[in-house]
Regions:
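Hydrophobic, small-residue-rich alpha-helical packing segments that form membrane-like cores
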Residues: 220-223, 227, 234-277, 281-288
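Solvent-exposed beta-strand/loop surfaces of large extracellular or lumenal domains
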Residues: 511-537, 555-560
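N-terminal secretory signal peptides and thylakoid transit peptides that target proteins
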Residues: 1-16
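Asp-box/WD-like beta-propeller blade repeats and closely related beta-sheet repeat scaffolds
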Residues: 179, 183-184, 213, 219-234
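Signal peptide processing junction and immediate N-terminal pro/mature segment
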Residues: 23-35
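Aromatic (Trp/Tyr) and acidic
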Residues: 39-150, 183-206, 242-259, 263, ...
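Helix-terminus loop motifs that line ligand-binding clefts
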Residues: 136, 150-189, 322-330
């Protein structure tokens, strides 16, 4: 039976994942009643609190560009870049990126060289020029705008000015790349311009530079003239035409030009078909994470529920076949392959970034908080582990179960042939550049505007947001929290005058007993998991909202992956703590075959690292069958002095468990941890106390465990 996803059913893909106790716990009773009256300064006449699935779309936001008719109204509206300023550990990730590989990639990557670069040439000619520059710039520039870093902003503007100045008379711009050599008529490759359009949109949000709109208008007018048989025909552009579609709608919402909707239909018609029931046009991990949203994007124009359903079906299909693992992603290293669905199968760093990007867009389009839940899962449990703690090196592939990170060729255990598990700043060409956008896109979409001129807190972290609400008043909301390493979020309102607007607070699906206080007064409301608390009132400066999100231990069983289990505490999933031995290697001698660097790049300043296990990793967990959660103890530790809880060994939350070694579970002939043994498994080894740490802080990890019989 096919579910109409407009009802946004909350079922997890497939019955293969069984919650023993935890994230998928029973929902609270349904109610739409306003909250009970609160005493003191929270007056009943001034307060309406209720749990809602999503904001209504009976009106459209008055203050920010949003979907124009005939596009369906968005449930959430993106705020301009730099509206959200992170603090605490979240800001620390951006600072580490700025001071690490992201901020210095211009000194290393040949594709960011200013010599013979096609992005700097009016005719689009040059030795260097494809996806790498915009991949990097869309993250680098947004980090600069958000941190208000003058050097990063200046460097970003150098490239943006070149793009604006070098648009050709035809309206086309960027590297003049043609694909289909040997064909009678090779086609102009449009893929590389798609991420650059995202860079231009961020720059326009930051600067309001009208030249961006003019460039895009001329470029899309040129796209309309490209013959259909030459339009979006190469593999990458054909798979990822949905990115082009997003940019067309972005411009339409600012100009109202109806010809853009004609172009949107042309793009949809010529993009790979992501609406095929039970299969995908290809199984490349980044294409999937980036392109599965294309049907739901076009649904905004088509109003055809089959388009929306197709996106949900694609997401569910991939998780059903290859995503029966913790961390929110799926195994596809580079492509997903039948028979390779064990948690040792990896995902590209690019794939994580594109999943976070897709989730943010789908959250706006559908109002369905499951997309925010998945962003949390990916960002907190997978993404940080793709880097060394200082963000000066990264690896192409990261897996939920990964006990070695080195320069060996692990093919065919993984699909890629080469040193794809090595932490190397000179390697991983696409991920080396695209990684920059991961955390900053998470930050930018942590707060959103709503159609009823309010604000929504989507992804909790220490931050502040400046936005226009209600009658047009500019307010500042400050969130004070160490979430996900604590259970409470404290929000303070600053406003020049009293202003009425709704504030939406997302209740994560794992949280079964959220509680709300306003100005110290408890508000009686059923906060349903997966919904939003909508707080409508007349807000005054220094009003204070406290949201408690009590975290519980949870154990998930992956029936399709040998009955293995994963252990959660709130939004965090935990890995065995494996001692990590770092071995420094030459960055230039351990690269993938397509790596290129500038002649003056100093490899001695940017070493590569192998990470080898310095302790046993092959354990089975002992579980209390009647109460699995009782098998674990939560241990709180001090906050790290450098403010980075994802650095190796610094997480302020750990778990304790018991287990036994499984001697037969070893490194296999491909140099990977062998596939999981079927649980329950027997072992005569002594019982040991095991230390578990958040998997996002574990570069070597076992996050899907066998269980003992």
């Amino acid at each position: 039976m096919t579910l109409d996803r407009r009802q946004f059913m909350e079922a997890v893909a497939g019955a293969a994942l069984t919650p023993l106790l935890g994230r998928a716990g029973s929902a609270m009773p349904s109610t739409d009643r306003p909250g009970a009256p609160a005493p003191s300064d929270v007056a009943a006449a001034d307060l309406d609190v209720r749990s809602v699935r999503r904001p209504p779309t009976t009106r459209r936001n008055s203050h920010y560009p949003t979907n124009r008719a005939p596009l369906l109204a968005e449930h959430f509206v993106k705020l301009p870049v730099a509206s959200v300023r992170p603090h605490g550990w979240l800001r620390r990730q951006l600072e580490l990126q700025r001071d690490g590989l992201t901020g210095h990639l211009g000194e290393i990557s040949i594709w960011l060289s200013k010599q013979d670069n096609a992005w700097l040439n009016k005719e689009g000619k040059g030795k260097h020029g494809w996806e790498e520059l915009p991949y990097w710039l869309k993250g680098y520039g947004d980090i600069g705008y958000t941190l208000d870093d003058a050097g990063m902003i200046r460097e970003s503007k150098f490239w943006i000015e070149a793009v604006l100045a070098n648009q050709r008379d035809s309206g086309d711009f960027g590297p003049d790349v043609f694909k289909g050599a040997g064909k009678r008529t090779p086609s102009r490759d449009l893929w590389t311009n798609m991420p650059m359009l995202f860079c231009l949109q961020s720059y326009h949000e930051y600067s309001q530079d009208a030249r961006v709109l003019r460039l895009m208008q001329r470029y899309f007018a040129w796209q309309r003239t490209v013959p259909e048989d030459l339009f979006l025909k190469d593999y990458w552009e054909n798979s990822r035409g949905g990115d082009n579609l997003v940019s067309v709608y972005w411009l339409y919402n600012r100009t109202g030009d109806p010809s853009l909707l004609e172009l949107a239909t042309k793009i949809h018609r010529n993009t790979a078909d992501w609406r095929q029931k039970g299969k995908l046009p290809n199984w490349h991990n980044v294409n999937i994470a980036q392109s599965f949203r294309e049907p739901a994007t076009y649904w905004l124009q088509s109003h055809d529920s089959r388009d929306l359903n197709a996106t949900y079906d694609d997401f569910d299909l991939v998780r059903e076949l290859y995503g029966q693992v913790p961390g929110g992603m799926f195994g596809a290293d580079e492509d997903a392959r039948p028979g390779y669905d064990d948690p040792r199968q990896a995902i590209e760093t690019c794939g994580m970034v594109e999943q976070i990007t897709s989730n943010a867009l789908l959250l706006r389009f559908t109002g369905d908080s499951r997309w925010a839940d998945n962003s949390e899962d990916v960002a907190l449990n997978m993404f940080p582990a793709a880097f060394t703690s200082d963000y000066r090196a990264l690896r192409y592939l990261t897996a939920p179960n990964m006990v070695v990170s080195d320069s060996r060729n692990h093919h065919p255990g993984i699909a890629n042939d080469g040193p794809f598990l090595m932490m190397n700043p000179f390697s991983s060409r696409c991920c080396q550049h695209n990684h920059a956008a991961g955390w900053i896109y998470y930050v930018e979409n942590s707060w959103m505007a709503t159609p009823d001129d309010g604000l929504a807190a989507q992804l909790y972290g220490e931050s502040e947001v400046r936005a226009r609400v209600g009658d047009g008043t500019d307010v500042r909301l400050v969130a004070d929290t160490r979430y996900p390493f604590e259970e409470q979020v404290r929000i303070t309102v600053e406003s020049p005058r009293p202003v009425a607007f709704p504030l939406y607070l997302r209740i994560p699906r794992w949280c079964r007993s959220a509680a709300l206080r306003i100005n110290g007064q408890h508000i009686a409301v059923a906060a349903r998991p997966g919904e939003y608390l909508r707080i409508a009132r007349r807000w005054r400066s220094n009003d204070r909202v406290v949201l408690d999100l009590p975290m519980e231990l949870g154990v998930r069983e992956w029936r399709k992956n040998k009955n293995s289990v994963s252990v959660d505490y709130g939004p965090l999933t935990f890995s065995l703590a494996i001692a990590e031995r770092y071995v420094q290697r030459s960055s230039t001698e351990t690269v993938q075959r397509d790596a290129r660097w500038q002649e003056g790049a100093d490899a001695s300043r940017w070493p590569a690292f192998e990470i080898q296990p310095a302790s046993a990793w092959n354990y089975g967990l002992r579980l209390n069958e009647s109460d699995p959660r009782s098998s674990f103890t939560v241990v709180r530790k001090s906050w790290p002095a450098d403010g980075n809880p994802f650095a190796t060994g610094q997480a302020p939350i750990e778990l304790r468990a018991t287990g036994r070694k499984l001697p037969s579970w070893e490194i296999d002939e491909h140099g990977l941890c062998a596939v999981l043994p079927q649980s329950p498994v027997a072992s005569d080894e002594p019982v040991e106390t095991l230390r578990l740490i958040p998997m996002g802080a574990a570069r070597l990890r076992i996050a899907a465990f066998p269980t003992l019989g």
